[in-house]
Structures are given as C-alpha cells and as structure tokens.
C-alpha cells in the first residue's frame, strides 16, 4: 500500500522539494497533470461585445460593479449553459456544480480573458477546435473547498465507535496497522484530520497501533499546499480546540501542522476517474468529489472500484450531502443515517 502500491506521483509531506517536483510536473507534463491556475496567463485586451449582444438576459451586467468588472466575459447564465454542455463530456454532472459554480465560473472567465476570447460561445469553439483545452477546463472544474473535521458527527462516530471496533479486531489478529485512503484530499485537511484524530483520540487507548494513510488528489497545486501543511485559522475552526492547540502549536494567521501528524500520510497525484491506490483499506474517505461531481455511470464505476479496495467490513465514508448510486454494491449502512457504509459482500 502507499506510494509504492499505486500509480501516480507521490509527495511526502515533510519533503518540500518533492512537492515542488509535483508542481513542476503539473506545469510541464500537460494532460490531466497540467494546472492552468498556476500557468502564467496571457492578458488580452478586452473584446467584449456590447451589453446584451449575446441575446441573453443580463444578470450581473450593467451596474456600477459591473463597470469595474467590465472584462468579465460571461454572465452566470452563460457559464451555467457552458457547464451543462461541457460536464457530460468530462464525465461530470452539472447539477453537482449548481451551488458552488461561482468558484468555477470565475476561473473559466479568467481563462477566457487569458485566451482573448469574447464570450462563452467562442470558448466552446476553442474546445471543439483544440482537444487539449478540455484538460484545462477539466482542471478549472475542480471545487477545492475543504476544512478540518468537516462533518464533525462522522469523525465522532469514527473515533468513538467504528475505529475502536476495527482496532480491537486488528489487535485480536495480531495486526498493528490501520490502512486508510482519503480520495480527493484537497490541501490535506481531511487526511490530516484523520491523522490528528488517530494520534490524539485513538493511540492513547490502543498503544502500538499505527496509521498508514494514502491521500490522493488530481490537483498538483493542492497537493503542494498539503505538503506545506499550513492553513488559515478558519480551516481549523471545527477541529476540537485541544487538538487544534496540540497539532498547530505555532502562532500567526496561518499555523503549520506539527511534523508528527504528517508522517503517517503519503500524498499521491491521481485522477480518481482512472487511477486509484491498490489497497486494501480498512477505511476510505471519498467525500464531496465522486458522488457530487461525477456523472452517474462514472459514479457506479468508481463505487465498484472503491468497494473492491475495502477489506471485508471495511468502511466507506461519503459526504454529508451525498448519496450512493442505486444498486447492490455490497455495502450496508454502518452508522445509522450518517454517510458511513461497511463492505458486506465478502
Ligand atoms: C470539494 S473538495 C473535497 C475535499 C475533501 N474530501 C472534503 O470533503 O473536505 C474536492 C476535491 O476533489 C478533487 N478532485 C476533483 N476531481 C477529482 C478527480 N477526478 N480525481 C481526484 N481528485 C479530484 C479536487 O481537486 C478537490 O481537492
């Protein structure tokens, strides 16, 4: 398990130069490894059509603020239409972006400006003409919101019930390692939460056990931030206070995670649609990525592959607002209404 067991680029969090290597790869390799947000943009002069020229309503255009943001080449509606058209081609579902589209639309707007394109229609034409632009759009569509201890009730049930039961059973078999995977780990908030929970919440009760944690994400820029391990205080607000004080001892607005909480985590750059670590895992966190943004057929494919990477009785955690696709995937609920499932079919 871990870096050796999986295809993809591995970053050890304590190794800043490795993080830089991932970043450099993302800039030079192209394809899914490309991170256009870190690519210098060509600044074009605005070639906006006059207001209303697109024939669509004008939300967000025409007011004073809009004069300041005159260079914004897309209305919200144009962006929505672009996403509705493009998402299926990326095996994504537009509905997942509905509530969080602001972040994505802003990025696409910046991309249009960088390319000197006047509107969403011109961007569609660019996509049709240049297949490599789809990789750029794909990367622009990644929603990056995360925080420590997100969905606190899930971490509480893991800490008090589900993981102690798993550790008891490991111990009874003479095993000492809990293997876990955070899929779509953003800047490390989720895997580091698990690392802190394990060390401060579980190790004192189960001395001698260890956590081996793989964390994967498609986005090299986020993985570089994860490797750095420093966060605005707002990202820590749900973490139990005593743990936050232990894990982030430094002063300032952007404290850094203490080294002992980083050691358990191996970061991998992988696209969940095509790559996964081998496993098997006792615990997989796949929250606010596949079951929000992926198209239903892809959700089913990914779910089958996730389940195949769980040990018998292994746990799958999804996001608080997500549900699993219909069908028998060999899972049962493991924590009442909370989005935690256990593998049953083995
Ligand atoms: C909304 S964040 C969720 C982060 C964390 N799991 C949580 O719930 O707080 C979604 C993450 O999934 C990543 N992501 C999106 N598409 C992906 C893909 N195809 N493969 C791997 N990671 C992906 C994004 O880069 C982003 O970091």
Spans of model-derived segments:
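Conserved AdoMet
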Residues: 72-181
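Conserved beta-strand signature within the Rossmann-like core of class I S-adenosyl-L-methionine
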Residues: 313-320
């Amino acid at each position: 398990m871990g870096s050796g067991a999986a295809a993809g680029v591995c970053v050890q969090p304590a190794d800043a130069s490795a993080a830089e290597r991932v970043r450099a790869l993302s800039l030079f390799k192209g394809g899914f490894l490309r991170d256009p947000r870190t690519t210098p943009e060509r600044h074009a002069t605005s070639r906006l059509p006059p207001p209303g020229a697109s024939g669509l309503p004008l939300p967000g255009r025409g007011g004073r603020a809009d004069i300041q943001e005159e260079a914004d080449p897309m209305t919200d509606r144009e962006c929505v239409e672009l996403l509705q058209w493009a998402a299926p081609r990326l095996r994504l579902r537009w509905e997942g972006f509905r509530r969080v589209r602001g972040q994505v639309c802003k990025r696409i707007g910046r991309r249009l400006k960088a390319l000197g394109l006047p509107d969403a229609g011109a961007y569609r034409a660019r996509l049709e003409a240049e297949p490599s632009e789809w990789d750029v759009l794909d990367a622009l569509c990644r929603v990056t919101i995360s925080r420590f201890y997100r969905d606190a009730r899930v971490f509480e049930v893991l800490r008090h019930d589900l993981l102690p039961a798993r550790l008891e059973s490991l111990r009874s078999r003479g095993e000492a390692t809990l293997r876990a995977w955070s899929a779509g780990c953003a800047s490390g908030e989720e895997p580091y939460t698990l690392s802190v929970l394990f060390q401060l919440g579980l190790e004192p009760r189960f001395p001698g056990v260890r956590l081996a944690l793989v964390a994967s994400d498609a986005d090299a820029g986020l993985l570089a931030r994860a490797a750095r391990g420093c966060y605005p205080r707002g990202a820590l607000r749900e973490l139990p206070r005593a743990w936050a004080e232990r894990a982030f001892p430094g002063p300032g607005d952007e404290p850094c995670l203490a080294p002992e909480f980083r050691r358990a985590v191996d970061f991998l750059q992988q696209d969940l649609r095509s790559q996964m670590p081998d496993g098997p895992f006792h615990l997989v966190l796949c929250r606010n990525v596949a079951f929000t943004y992926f198209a239903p057929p892809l959700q089913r494919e990914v779910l089958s592959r996730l389940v195949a990477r769980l040990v018998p009785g292994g746990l799958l955690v999804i996001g608080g607002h997500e549900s699993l696709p219909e069908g028998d995937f060999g899972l049962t609920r493991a924590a009442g209404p909370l989005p935690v499932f256990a593998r049953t079919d083995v």
